[in-house]
Curated annotation (Swiss-Prot):
Conditions for induction: By stress conditions e.g. heat shock.
PANTHER family, per database record: HEAT SHOCK PROTEIN 70KDA
Family, as annotated: Belongs to the heat shock protein 70 family.
Functional summary from the UniProt entry: Acts as a chaperone.
GO molecular-function term, one example from the UniProt record: ATP-dependent protein folding chaperone
Origin: domain of life: Bacteria
Annotated protein name in UniProt: Chaperone protein DnaK
Pfam families: HSP70
Residues found modified as Phosphothreonine: T198
Region (Disordered): 603-647
Gene: dnaK
Cited InterPro entries: ATPase_NBD (IPR043129), Chaperone_DnaK (IPR012725), Heat_shock_70_CS (IPR018181), HSP70_C_sf (IPR029048), HSP70_peptide-bd_sf (IPR029047), Hsp_70_fam (IPR013126)
């Protein structure tokens, strides 16, 4: 059975893993690293993903998209989105359906499309390692993602050519990874997940049931717009203000300078986790009428901690709420697990230790634990692993709007999923012919202060006094945390239901169009790969041909030298164009000229004792002979790098 891979689709970095035997393998990408920057760049009709996109961000800030996860499944009018508009160098726009999209090179893109490029990179990374096509995956999301954000993540997977078998919460995945190697009996753990763009905390019980593990989420809480990006922004704002004081220039008006600042701030933040101070030195950051300006600012760890103190404090209240919802106190928690790159900050670790009263575990890799957990869940779904039972929860209350604009809960937050619950309602007026069902998600008492997930109408209700008709509303939430709602008139049996999608979101037609667009890009990638391979083989043959003519000397006639030189020139000219078939034809033509010459020289050398013999196979399509074997290695390495840069 094909493997189901686990993907941590992160705000800042992404990671992919797979279960092999009884061990999880975190897979290295083409660049040799186990995490890939969640950055996508659009440059000269090419799509760059990961490190190659990050490398060119400074020179292409408006077309380099990062932290796109913060937009997925969100409305343009959301306060969090409006805040981001002033912080990123790329353009965030309002789509026709009201969602937050981005615009690159005059092309409008949904966050799902951009995320799909990252998922395609993860898919390709896994396929290169496994040596087989991958079509199924478990993808992680922040525990506090709402229904629209979860559905949007599944759509991104679909656009990337993946059947998303399960959406799993990131803290839950980390607990799976933690529990796999820790056979320490029953215990309750707190997973504190501070990533690049989101924060979650989950209280999880790991129970040993006759040798099997049951991992049950007791409660979860968080903030989907709080993470390492906000820590970077706090430092960037400080640097901008300091520079403005010194030079009277506002760097926020310069996208190029802002991108350089972002890179420097991220680097400085990381350095300050292990050192007490660092210097940010950016020569020629900008220029005005008086000449070029240079930014040189020393930042201490204490200064950074002062800048982000309120951000760290914001993570503690969700911890308190999660404990309360689980009915536990800090003394009931046996282990605290830190996940997400931002959790490496010493101040964060100190505050978490102060709150829970115990030192966080250091034996969990915060960058890889989530992908490892996703891979374990993938193995459970495929049947490769049978000794783990995962019981997750819905993070937010689900309900409908009733008379007076009140939110009436149907499924309370922290209910174990999958779950199905029903409640009977009635009409608010005499002879009311229909009822409108508006479905909301959130914790506010007034319905419209929560997230509207969707609405529908149940009609043809027989005339009756108010309060008489019996309308049964049922909520059915699956293991992905995605909701289906139905309403049934118990007197007539008439029923109406909807699979909840965001009241915006992508339509099936839009998703299909994006899939076709992605497939078209895949075909372009395949053509580029074929072209690169043909060029590499041609270059190797040209090099071998020139060497052969030189080594054979007077064993080659003048007519043969002329024929070889002409064929080499024609092949070199062909490699400068994009016609694969022409390159292959001219490669074959050069081979046909060389083969009889080298064969003759080889036989003559053999007759003379073979001391200076030539191997005629050295010119057979660039695949045989020791010299070409060495070239093959070079071609493959070079090709992999080029392929990644062109995706």
């Amino acid at each position: 059975m094909a493997k189901i891979i686990g993907i941590d689709l992160g705000t800042t970095n992404s990671c992919v893993a797979v279960l092999e035997g009884d061990k999880v393998k975190v897979i290295e990408n083409a660049e040799g690293t186990r995490t890939t920057p969640s950055i996508v760049a659009y440059k000269d009709s090419e799509i760059l993903v990961g490190q190659s996109a990050k490398r060119q961000a400074v020179t292409n800030p408006k077309n380099t998209l990062f932290a796109i996860k913060r937009l997925i499944g969100r409305r343009y009018e959301d306060q969090a989105v409006q805040k981001d508009i002033g912080l990123v160098p790329y353009k965030i726009i309002k789509a026709d359906n009201g969602d937050a999209w981005v615009e690159v090179n005059d092309k409008k893109l949904a966050p799902q499309q951009v995320s799909a490029e990252i998922l395609k990179k993860m898919k390709k990374t896994a396929e290169d390692y496994l040596g087989e096509t991958v079509t199924e995956a478990v993808i992680t999301v922040p525990a506090y993602f709402n229904d629209a954000q979860r559905q949007a993540t599944k759509d991104a997977g679909r656009i990337a050519g993946l059947d998303v078998k399960r959406i799993i919460n990131e803290p839950t995945a980390a607990a799976l990874a933690f529990g796999m190697d820790k056979k320490e009996g029953d215990r309750k753990v707190a997973v504190y997940d501070l990533g690049g763009g989101t924060f979650d905390v989950s209280i999880i019980e790991i129970a040993d049931l006759d040798g099997d593990q049951q991992i049950e989420v007791l409660s979860t809480n968080g903030d989907t717009f709080l993470g390492g990006e906000d820590f970077d922004t706090a430092l960037i704002d400080y640097l901008v203000e300091e520079f403005k004081k010194e030079q009277s220039v506002n760097l926020k008006n310069d996208p190029l300078a802002l991108q350089r600042l972002k890179e420097a701030a991220e680097k400085a933040k990381i350095e300050l986790s292990s050192s007490s101070s660092t210097e940010i030195n950016l020569p020629y950051i900008t220029a005005d009428a008086t000449g070029p300006k240079h930014l040189v600012i020393n930042v201490t760890r204490a200064k950074l901690e002062g800048l982000v103190a309120d951000l760290v404090a914001r993570t503690i209240e969700p911890c308190r709420i999660a404990l309360k919802d689980a009915g536990l106190s800090t003394s009931d928690i046996s282990d605290v697990i830190l996940v997400g790159g931002q959790s490496r900050m010493p101040m964060v670790q100190q505050k978490v230790q102060e709150f829970f009263g115990k030192e966080p575990r250091k034996d969990v890799n915060p960058d890889e634990a989530v992908a490892i957990g996703a891979a374990i869940q993938g193995a459970v779904l495929s049947g490769d692993k049978t000794d783990v039972l995962l019981l997750d929860v819905t993070p937010l209350t689900l309900g409908i709007e009733t008379m007076g604009g009140v939110l009436t809960p149907i499924i309370e937050k922290n209910t174990t999923i999958p779950a199905k619950k029903s409640q009977v309602f009635s009409t608010a007026a005499d002879n009311q012919p229909a009822v409108d069902i508006s479905v909301y998600q959130g914790e506010r008492k007034m319905a419209q202060q929560n997230k509207l997930l969707g609405n529908f109408q149940l009609g043809d209700i027989p005339p009756a006094p108010r309060g008489v008709p019996q309308i049964e509303v049922s909520f059915d939430i699956n293991a992905d945390g995605i909701l289906k709602v139905s309403a049934k008139d118990k007197s007539t049996g008439k029923e109406q239901s909807i699979q909840i999608k965001a009241n915006s979101g992508l339509s099936d037609a839009e998703i299909e169009a994006m899939i076709k667009d992605a497939e078209a890009n895949a075909e372009e990638d395949r053509k580029f790969e074929e072209l690169a391979k043909a060029r590499n083989e041609a270059d190797a043959l040209v090099s071998s041909s020139n060497k052969a003519v030189k080594d054979l000397g007077d064993k080659v006639t003048e007519d043969e030298k002329t024929a070889i030189t002409t064929a080499v020139s024609e092949l070199e000219a062909a490699t400068k164009e994009n016609d694969v078939e022409d390159i292959k034809a001219k490669t074959e033509a050069l081979q046909n000229i060389l083969m009889p010459i080298t064969q003759r020289a080889y036989e003559q050398a053999q007759g003379a004792g073979g001391a200076q013999g030539f191997d005629p196979n050295a010119f057979q399509g660039g695949d045989a002979g020791q010299q070409q074997k060495a070239d093959d290695g070079v071609v493959d390495a070079e090709f992999t790098e080029v392929k990644d840069d062109k995706k």
